Structures are given as structure tokens and as C-alpha cells.
Design a protein with these regions (language model features):
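Glycine-rich tight-turn/loop motif centered on a GG-T
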Residues: 16-19, 64, 97-113, 155-169
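Short beta-strand segments at enzyme active-site cores
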Residues: 39-44, 90-91, 128-132, 149-153, ...
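Alpha-helix-loop-beta-strand connector modules within alpha/beta enzyme cores
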Residues: 49-75, 107-129, 166-187
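Short, conserved acidic/polar surface loops in the N-terminal third of protein domains
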Residues: 53, 78-84, 92-94, 100-105, ...
């Protein structure tokens, strides 16, 4: 069954750019739950430029749906995940200064690290997802590490179909008026 988990990082970006607590990420997450989302996803980064570690702790206290914490498994991140015990952790190999996640794990090269982390999270009943590029051997590597799920980096995906070759859509213009009935012949 497909489930929707909404990433609220951009809400935190707006809050942080304004200073203060508007918009309130906690209230936004609660509203998203009321609107029907199955979970909330956050990606705290070491520089705290959007979701902060305290946001994660506060979200865990109030959410009624799943919490998914994404991030690079640096020691402070691993400690946060073990403390908060979300439903899911998504391991992402992004650099601390990355604007966004732009490459997945090489699950073959990092197998020992990922297997060890997965085991630690499983001990706390935390589901593990691994962010990876789509080659089949990396997908198999994620399974071999014990991951329950995979988060695929779609930037690295090859096109799934040939380029779009249909003609471009016509501009939206009003339809011409219907033809007028002929005028009666003069007498």
C-alpha cells in the first residue's frame, strides 16, 4: 500500500529565514496529519539551516503518524535517531554543506558501515531505508545490508521512456463563436 510522508524542511527554511517561530513547524506538521498524510519526514543537517534537532524531538512528542528522519549518519545524527526512535530512519550520504541530497549510497563500497548502522537501528525497532542510486546491484546491496526500504535518487535514473514527441499543446484561446444562421433573403 502506498503511503504519503510529507517532508517539512522547507517550512523550517521559511521559519529560519524570518527568525522567530513563524511558520511553526510543529503546527504545520499537525495540520498535514489532519489533512491525511501518513507521516512526516524531516532531514536535520548539522548546520541547522532548516529542521533542527530540537524540532525533531518536539515533533516526536506530538505526531500521531509516522516520523521519518533522513540524514547522513554522523555520530550526532545516529545519537538523535536512537534517542527519538522514529518509525523510520533514511540513511543519506550527503555532505554537511550539500544544498540537497544529490547522490545515493554505494551499498557495495559501504556495506559494512550500512550493515552495522542497520543492526543498531533494528535493535530499537526502527525501520531502515537507504538512499541510493538505481543500479540493480546497489538495490541488492541495500537488501544485503538489512534495509527494509530504499529511497531512490531519481536524478541518477535513466529515462524510463523515449522523450516526449507529441506536438506541444495548443495555446488556450477561446473557441470561435458558432456560425450565425443565414439571413433571410430580401423580398
Amino acid at each position: 500500500m502506498t503511503k504519503l510522508s510529507v517532508n517539512i524542511n522547507k517550512i523550517a527554511v521559511i521559519r529560519n529565514s524570518r527568525g522567530g517561530n513563524l511558520p511553526d513547524v510543529i503546527r504545520a506538521a499537525q495540520a498535514i496529519e489532519r489533512f491525511g498524510a501518513d507521516g512526516i519526514t524531516v532531514h536535520p543537517r548539522p548546520d541547522a539551516r532548516h529542521i533542527r534537532y530540537d524540532d525533531v524531538r518536539n515533533l516526536k512528542r506530538v505526531l500521531t503518524t509516522e516520523l521519518n528522519i533522513e540524514g547522513n549518519p554522523i555520530p550526532s545524527f545516529v545519537d538523535l535517531v536512537l534517542e527519538v526512535q522514529p518509525a523510520q530512519v533514511t540513511l543519506v550520504p550527503d555532505a554537511p554543506d550539500a544544498i540537497t541530497s544529490n547522490a545515493g549510497w554505494d551499498t557495495m563500497a559501504h556495506r559494512d558501515l550500512l550493515t552495522g548502522l542497520t543492526a543498531r537501528f533494528h535493535e530499537r525497532a526502527i525501520r531502515v531505508s537507504i538512499f541510493l542510486d538505481p543500479p540493480p546491484e546497489l538495490v541488492a546491496g541495500a537488501r544485503a545490508c538489512g534495509a527494509h526500504r530504499q529511497h531512490h535518487d531519481t536524478q541518477a535514473s535513466p529515462p524510463h521512456s523515449p522523450p516526449h514527441t507529441s506536438p506541444p499543446p495548443r495555446p488556450l484561446t477561446p473557441a470561435p463563436p458558432p456560425p450565425r444562421p443565414p439571413l433571410p433573403a430580401p423580398h
